[in-house]
A protein has these predicted regions:
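Charged, cofactor-coupling segments
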Residues: 463
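Short, solvent-exposed loop/turn segments at the edges of extracellular beta-sandwich modules
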Residues: 454-460
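C-terminal motif of bacterial Sec signal peptides marking the signal peptidase cleavage site
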Residues: 13-16
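N-terminal acidic, glycine/proline-rich low-complexity segments
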Residues: 19-427, 433-435, 441-450, 466-472
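Sec-dependent signal peptide recognition
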Residues: 2-7
Length: 474
């Protein structure tokens, strides 16, 4: 079973440097990230749901809650669109299990569908994502609202004796979570602080007034507010991707892909789950690290409210994210493991978190492997024209593919996310090892170094390992 680890942000006194506090990365929670999806059912949500279901193996899906928003004030629970997608998922589930045994059975997902707040009057007239920003006036009072099955389910999940964070993805409005937090505070005062501290909301804009209410009255909850999904993943941002959609989804053969309702990539809500995929970027551990779902900074005046830094922090990952999505779409139609591509595996026996002193040599190394056979077909499509110019044939390539087709390639680079603002000089020692000399610092600083390993098959898939090096003064 895949394991996902969460960073517990604590401080301790380092034994190697008395009286110097350094981040402790030794305490970890084992298990997959717990996620709740709240969706208002509009077109982008339906496309994002197709994408999401193919990553259900990477997460523990605790609830899918149908809600409303300022764009879909009545919600869409009356339309069985989720049930229809799950029926299609059920058709491809046997093949998906071949490629990863952790894919949840369809009935497991059906059991966690709930209806949340779809009351139009709970969304104030005239509000806009352009004005409902961190610090906006509170316009709603969830104490006046009725409970819903969705809000009650959120309460149940947060009260469970499980220390893992609960990532609440707000594809639409936040009101269902706002009601849950209000009930939690009033009816479970002794459990409230422990429970609310586990809540992490990823909001695709504030699409109602619930986010502002949570900021003020439930500051123990963490909010990640994304605006830069617009211009990267949303409607119209990738209008030149129609070939991708027609070839891999709307091709008349894909049971789930046919529910992708747009003619091009149109998934404004997809960033809400991309950072919870177990790809090695560790974006789930801290919103400032960054990953496929963007990178965030803390908003001034708030302890737990963050906004995404830029469009570029999302756009730089679109290509590997879509290649990975393409591979999983192909898993749906491929009953034999060896006939599809899978991401390389990276193992770091010595651990990803290192503490050193200024001036010390830091060596980072990993073990990279790819279980898939060499992709002769893909290699010939990519480079066959060059080999043919030298008199080679495809049969020549098939004779000894391991000698002519690389198993994988890798890159190393310094990444944003660390506190050290200078640059380091990485010295490469092959595909799986680099070193550098720890720079001079006056106080403990962190440097993030990323290993990116990608295979040479089609579609190319990428895995990562993020090393976090804490540098202490001499």
């Amino acid at each position: 079973m895949k394991k996902f680890f969460y960073l517990l942000s604590l401080l301790l006194v380092c034994q190697a440097c008395k009286n110097v506090e350094v981040p402790d990365t030794s305490r970890q929670w084992e298990g997959k990230p717990r996620v709740i999806v709240m969706t208002d059912g509009e077109v982008d949500d339906r496309c994002s749901m197709v994408h999401f279901l193919l990553y259900a193996n990477d997460m523990q899906v605790d609830a899918i809650i149908q809600s409303n928003s300022c764009f879909q004030r009545n919600g869409w629970s009356s339309d069985p669109w989720i049930e229809e997608q799950l029926a299609a998922y059920e058709k491809v589930y046997p093949n998906l299990k071949v490629h990863d045994a952790d894919y949840p059975a369809t009935d497991e997902l059906r059991k966690v569908i709930y209806v949340g707040d779809e009351t139009p009057s709970h969304v104030p007239q005239g509000i806009s994502y352009k004005t409902i920003l961190p610090g906006a006036n509170v316009l709603v009072n969830p104490a006046e609202w009725e409970d819903t099955p969705g809000s009650d389910r959120i309460v149940e999940i947060l009260l469970e004796d499980d220390p893992r964070p609960v990532y609440i993805q707000c594809w639409g409005g936040v009101n269902t979570a706002a009601k849950a937090f209000q009930k939690l505070q009033v009816q479970y005062p002794d459990e409230y602080e422990r429970a609310i501290a586990k809540a992490v909301l990823y909001c695709i804009w504030y699409q109602d007034a619930g986010g502002s209410y949570i900021e003020k009255y439930h500051p123990g909850a963490t909010i990640l507010l994304s605006h830069h999904f617009s211009g990267s993943w949303d409607y119209g941002a990738m209008s030149n991707s129609d070939n991708f959609v027609s070839q891999y989804m709307q091709n008349g053969q894909h049971p789930l892909g046919k529910f992708y309702t747009q003619p091009y990539i149109s998934e404004g809500d997809t960033p809400a789950f991309l950072n919870f995929i177990d790809n090695g970027l560790r974006a789930c551990e801290d919103p400032t690290y960054g990953g496929w779902g963007g990178r965030f900074y803390r908003v001034d005046g708030f302890e737990n409210v963050y906004r995404d830094v830029s469009l570029g922090a999302l756009r730089e990952w679109i290509e590997p994210a879509l290649r990975d999505f393409q591979a999983r779409l192909e898993w749906c139609l491929t009953p034999v493991y060896e006939d599809a591509n899978h991401a390389p595996e990276i193992v770091v026996p010595e651990g990803l978190d290192i503490v050193v002193r200024s001036g010390e040599k830091v060596t980072l190394k990993a073990q990279i492997s790819d279980k898939d056979p060499r992709d002769v077909e893909g290699a010939w499509r990519l480079r066959g024209h060059m080999w043919e110019q030298k008199g080679r044939t495809k049969a020549w390539l098939e004779e000894n593919p391991e000698k002519r087709i690389e198993e994988y390639r890798s890159d190393w680079c310094q990444m944003p996310g660390g506190s050290y603002t200078g640059s380091i000089d990485l010295v490469f020692e092959g595909k799986d090892q680099v070193h550098f000399v720890a720079p001079e610092v006056k106080s403990p600083q962190t440097v993030h170094v990323l290993l990116e390993a990608y295979d040479m098959a089609l579609p190319r898939m990428t895995s990562y390992a993020r090393f976090i090096v804490t540098i202490l003064p001499r």
